[in-house]
Amino acid sequence: MDFSLKQLAAATMMMASLAAFSTAAHATITPQQSAVILKTFSDTHVTDFRQFLGALAKSELAQKDNLGPTISAFLDNKALAPEQQNEIYRLLGLYTRLKYGKAATDTLRELVAIPTVNLDDVPQYENPQFLKIADKIKDLAKAFNLNFRNIDNRVYEVSLEGSGDEVVGIHAHADVVPVTPENWVLKDGTQLDPFKVTLIGDRMYGRGTEDDKNGIVVAMYAMKVIKEEQLPLARNFKLLIDTTEETSGDAIPYYFEHNPVPNYNLALDGGYPVVIAEKGSGTVMATFPVRKGE
């Protein structure tokens, strides 16, 4: 199970749960059950979420996992208990992965192929590669029927409107750290292209596959599905794509100088208690002797 597709399902579930309801509840569908559902429907063509739920309701999986009542209530437009809402969110995430997993991976390949690294003596907002990725994201937003704003080539804003006044800010970034191509060699001697996504086993290799172009992809596809399925949104969503996260960090402050700060803010490339670490993580602890003051 590759990382980006896990994130695609998770992001859809998360955004759907934030969008419409405020009651907290624990989802009852386990990772093991999710894996079985994905495997069962991996070769099945799904057209829309309701069709997917209808097919799932007729399967032994729904009976075994007692999902029938939740699915029936949703399809009949009945009020759902908090636990049922979370089950629907999780199923929506699984549906998104089944329907758009390959497309999302292809989009990630296209974004990774754009070498959005910092250039000496060239501001990010004048860097040709950032102008290129801005156009790519703009075209993608248009294809997904999402709103797009380019804030002076500093931040790219992709938004999905809801009925309320509150705004949920989803943060990702388009810039990546520089690469040393000769270091991109696997233990078996395989030479990799840093700006070409290479899938080996259950791992994707390529600069930005984790940090953080996958965050752009999963958020936009999650917004696409929410739009397609016409989910009721009590909050507005704004995906804020930073261009300076790996360098000066001045793009987001520039954005907030000219735009309101969202009511809620989420970073897709790290969140407590889980944080993505591209090359491993570590904790440094230091002690210093106390010196008496004079």
Annotated model-derived regions:
Residues 208-284:
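Acidic/histidine-rich catalytic neighborhood of metal-dependent amide-processing enzymes
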Residues 186-192, 280-288:
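A short, gly/pro- and small-residue-rich
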Residues 9, 155-156, 266, 286:
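Well-ordered beta-strand positions enriched in small/hydrophobic/aromatic, beta-favoring residues
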Residues 1-25:
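Gram-negative bacterial Sec-dependent N-terminal signal peptides
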Residues 38-44, 48-205, 228, 233:
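Acidic/His- and Gly-rich active-site-bordering loop/insert found
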